[in-house]
């Protein structure tokens, strides 16, 4: 399928109607973002990202799930209140798209303007 199934906006720019969205809030959040599905996705996971160092290589790992949903749909955005986004990603999402493919993304922040966006990533399992 063309394009991404989810877009990310700062919560203040999303124009959410009270009660018209789902939410997951971490303790002491530093930012609120909204995931806006452009089409339905299934098996959604919001999880902790860790890392493993090996020589001069840094490998991102998928750690514990913080929030899961059977599906996300365009009529029900998801607000995430997240901790500070660090240089090395510390949170990620995954879902299964309409073609049945697993899609995984790190939640990252632009070094230029502080915009939070999704970067497609392949995570190792935590070990």
Question: Where are the model-predicted features located?
Answer:
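Extracellular beta-sheet/turn segments enriched in Thr/Pro/Gly and aliphatic residues
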Residues: 2-26, 103-127
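Short, surface-exposed binding/anchoring microloops in extracellular/periplasmic proteins
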Residues: 6-54
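Short structured motifs
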Residues: 17-21, 32, 62-66, 77-79
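Hydrophobic beta-strand residues in large extracellular and virion-surface proteins
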Residues: 33-35, 44-46, 80, 91-95, ...
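Solvent-exposed serine/threonine-rich low-complexity stretches and specific carbohydrate-binding patches
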Residues: 54-73, 107-111
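Short linear proline/tyrosine/threonine-rich motifs used for host-factor recruitment
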Residues: 56-60, 69, 93-95, 104, ...
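Short, solvent-exposed, Trp/other aromatic-anchored flexible loops in extracytoplasmic proteins
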Residues: 65-101
């Amino acid at each position: 399928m063309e394009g991404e199934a989810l877009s990310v906006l700062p919560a203040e720019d999303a124009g959410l109607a009270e009660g018209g969205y789902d939410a997951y809030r971490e303790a002491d959040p530093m930012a609120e973002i909204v995931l806006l599905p452009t089409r339905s996705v299934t098996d959604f996971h919001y999880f902790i990202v860790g890392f493993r160092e090996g020589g001069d290589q840094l490998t991102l790992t998928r750690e514990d799930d913080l929030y899961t949903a059977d599906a996300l749909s365009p009529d029900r955005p998801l607000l995430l209140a997240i901790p500070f986004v660090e240089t090395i990603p510390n949170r990620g999402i995954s879902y299964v798209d309409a073609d049945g493919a697993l899609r995984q993304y790190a939640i990252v922040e632009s070094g230029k303007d502080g915009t939070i966006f999704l970067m497609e990533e392949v995570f190792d399992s935590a070990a």
